[in-house]
């Protein structure tokens, strides 16, 4: 069977599994570009179900505990909305609702008998990215040749969530290989942005993000090696965190290039609130259960006191490689004014090294084997590379390196980390408090979104994978791109020293991004995830109050 035939059958299998009662008339919505209102207006969900799907994960658990809601009712509501979302934006690669229903029924039965919740996610419908191992369910990593691969066990993270009472019922799309800032594969097709289907959903956790945005699930455990949690969250206006990578157990997760551990995968939530973000991150920190897990460091979750007094925040507007579009800069300046109005302090921060050198080091580290794992997996069926991956090879090359060269990359990474640490420490000279900044704010990407197959610059997120600094994505409430506030920066002359700045600059037209949400990235120091969350919560309260 050809790869095209395999892909066609796989996509049809997912769509056919959706119950008839939750099917949309495709002709009715084909011309829509903003589909965010369809779940509420299509008539499939009752008013009660719409109210359920407006709940955060913590609110679902509270309603179940107070007996206002059952796990089965929660799954029915979110399951219906997930089915609608998939038909609008193509976000699923597996649908196993009946399995989820059995889980929910067991939770309800147990709670009725004992009056005790199974755990902090009791009855919460949680979608899982393709990447996660779920016993008996397909894990493809977006490759046609892996269509029939089914692991025999849950990954460590999935086990943690299952033990906490999460209900699993579907898996979401990711791009071929996972190494793309857009979610598209030959196997599953293209996942669309619900705010503008002509724009990218982000990647690699694009299926997760669009499903959360359309409220088919309140939260997802997403993964990030170069921006894969943060970029999709940003392009869909959501909350997210990329924790310090060593804090999260990753045993049993899929990875074609698993031998590369110099820049480590991280896992964290995409969700609708800081409260869910904090609760979920604490849960997947998984201490003390992870004390013998070789993929993480057993660090207890710290109790951090609420912040009193003045915050000091570093502002990094751009990295001297790719100039962000005007609305990205405006969102940062808006955040700065909001903080200063509330009595906090914001100081300028510059990265203390060449960020173009840093991203080249990052990609050289990712692909020390010269893409051999990816290419051999494609050769099994003859499927082609997706454009996003081809672009990365054109820019960064495809060369297998020696052991000595690999060691030199590790030396460079260590030097980058030392320089960044020293620059952060040196902010004591800039702040009125005499202490280093509490966090940095910076762009997540050079734009609020991108057209499909645009060659996107990863540097604003991948930098913090190289350094292994935790970072949070915060939505900027009531902030929309418009020509009056965000005119084209006609006086800016793009840099010729890299292949990204000029195309990024030439792309910008305010009307192209008028429906896109805006976000900022908040960065903390390694293993200070709890402190970062507290700082981000203060900022979130201020931004939502504006």
Swiss-Prot record:
Metabolic or biological pathway, per its Swiss-Prot or TrEMBL entry: Mycotoxin biosynthesis
Pfam families hit by this protein: Amidase
EC number: 3.5.1.-
Transmembrane regions listed in the UniProt entry: none
Induction: Highly expressed under trichothecene-producing conditions.
Keyword Ion transport carried by entry: no
GO molecular function annotations of the record: hydrolase activity
Active site as annotated: 129 (charge relay system), 204 (charge relay system), 228 (acyl-ester intermediate)
Keyword terms, alphabetized: Hydrolase
Stated family: Belongs to the amidase family.
Biological function: Amidase; part of the gene cluster that mediates the biosynthesis of butenolide, a mycotoxin that shows antibiotic activity but does not seem to play a major role in the spread of head blight in wheat. Butenolide is derived from glutamic acid via a 4-acetamido-2-butenoic acid intermediate.
Designated name of the protein: Amidase FG08078
Organism: Gibberella zeae (strain ATCC MYA-4620 / CBS 123657 / FGSC 9075 / NRRL 31084 / PH-1)
């Amino acid at each position: 069977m050809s790869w095209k035939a395999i892909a066609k059958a796989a996509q049809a299998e997912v769509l056919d599994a959706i119950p008839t009662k939750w099917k949309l008339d495709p002709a009715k919505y084909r011309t829509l570009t903003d589909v965010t209102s369809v779940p509420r207006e299509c008539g499939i969900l009752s008013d009660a179900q719409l109210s359920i799907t407006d709940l955060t994960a913590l609110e679902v658990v509270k309603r179940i505990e107070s007996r206002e809601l059952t796990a089965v009712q929660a799954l029915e509501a979110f399951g219906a909305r997930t089915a609608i979302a998939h038909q609008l934006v193509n976000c699923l690669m597996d649908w196993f609702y009946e399995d989820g229903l059995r889980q929910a029924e067991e939770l309800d039965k147990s709670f009725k008998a004992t009056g005790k919740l199974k755990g902090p996610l009791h009855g919460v419908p949680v979608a899982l990215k393709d990447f996660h191992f779920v016993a008996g369910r397909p894990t493809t990593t977006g490759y046609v040749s892996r269509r029939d691969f089914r692991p025999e066990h849950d990954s460590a993270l999935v086990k943690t969530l299952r033990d906490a009472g999460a209900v699993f019922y579907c898996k979401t799309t990711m791009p071929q290989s996972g190494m793309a800032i857009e979610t598209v594969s030959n196997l599953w097709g293209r996942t669309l942005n619900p705010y503008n289907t002509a724009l990218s959903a982000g990647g690699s956790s694009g299926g997760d993000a669009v499903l959360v945005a359309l409220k088919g699930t309140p939260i997802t455990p997403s993964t990030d090696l170069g921006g894969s949690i943060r970029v999709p969250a940003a392009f869909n206006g959501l909350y997210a965190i990329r924790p310090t990578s060593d804090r999260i157990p990753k045993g049993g997760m899929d990875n074609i290039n698993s031998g590369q551990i110099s820049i480590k995968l991280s896992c964290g939530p995409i969700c609708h609130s800081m409260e869910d973000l904090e609760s979920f991150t604490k849960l997947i920190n998984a201490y003390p259960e992870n004390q013998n897990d070789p993929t993480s460091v057993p660090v207890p979750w710290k109790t951090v006191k609420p912040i009193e007094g003045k915050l000091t925040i570093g502002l990094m507007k751009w990295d001297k490689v790719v100039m962000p579009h005007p609305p990205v800069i405006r969102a940062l300046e808006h955040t700065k004014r909001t903080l200063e109005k509330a009595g906090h302090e914001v100081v300028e921060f510059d990265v203390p090294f060449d960020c173009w050198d840093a991203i080249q080091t990052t990609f050289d580290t990712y692909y020390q084997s010269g893409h051999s794992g990816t290419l051999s997996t494609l050769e099994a069926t003859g499927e082609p590379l997706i454009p996003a991956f081809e672009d990365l090879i054109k820019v960064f090359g495809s060369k297998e390196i020696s052991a000595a060269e690999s060691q030199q990359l590790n030396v460079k990474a260590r030097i980058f980390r030392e320089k960044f640490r020293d620059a952060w420490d040196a902010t004591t000279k800039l702040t009125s408090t005499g202490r280093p900044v509490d966090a940095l704010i910076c762009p997540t990407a050079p734009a609020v979104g991108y057209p499909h197959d645009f060659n996107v610059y990863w540097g604003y997120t991948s930098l913090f994978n190289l350094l292994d600094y935790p970072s949070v994505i915060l939505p900027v409430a009531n902030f929309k791109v418009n020509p009056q506030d965000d005119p084209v920066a006609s006086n800016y002359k793009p840099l010729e020293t890299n292949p990204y700045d000029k195309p990024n600059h030439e792309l910008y037209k305010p009307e192209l991004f008028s429906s896109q949400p805006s976000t900022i990235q908040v960065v903390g120091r390694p293993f200070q995830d709890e402190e970062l969350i507290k700082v981000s919560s203060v900022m979130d309260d201020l931004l939502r109050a504006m």
